[in-house]
């Protein structure tokens, strides 16, 4: 569970205190760690654009927010990003499981997997792709500060190889 633990520790050390999550198989270990933490509010969402709305409200109420999701949800959330986050300069950290790329078993995930980086670029969301738990920890710490400097979301995109760190004994 080394990959998920690195993300969790970085979120904790960055004082992220409010998370909205949309279930994904790759995020299951991370979600379990977060759900066991009484100092982090985790609101499960049914769709990613719902998570963007919930986190916008939490930010306006003084919370330091993150959204945990898979990449297909960016396609569902472009209007919320453009009309809410861009217009009102709302920072949030995006922890994104990159589906539809390496090792993908579900054909329907592949188109969005190929387009995700371009979509994030069109949305002007800075995106980082950690390859190791150590790099993930450092980049999350950096990104959680940077999002406030730019008053906008910052994304971390985790591919299938990253989640293999959770399989290590």
Curated annotation (Swiss-Prot):
Pfam families: TPP_enzyme_N. Gene3D superfamilies: 3.40.50.970. It comes from the Archaea. It is an enzyme of class 4 (lyase). GO terms for biological process: coenzyme M biosynthetic process. Its EC number is 4.1.1.79. It catalyses: 3-sulfopyruvate + H(+) = sulfoacetaldehyde + CO2. Involved in the biosynthesis of the coenzyme M (2-mercaptoethanesulfonic acid). Catalyzes the decarboxylation of sulfopyruvate to sulfoacetaldehyde. Belongs to the ComD family. This is Sulfopyruvate decarboxylase subunit alpha.
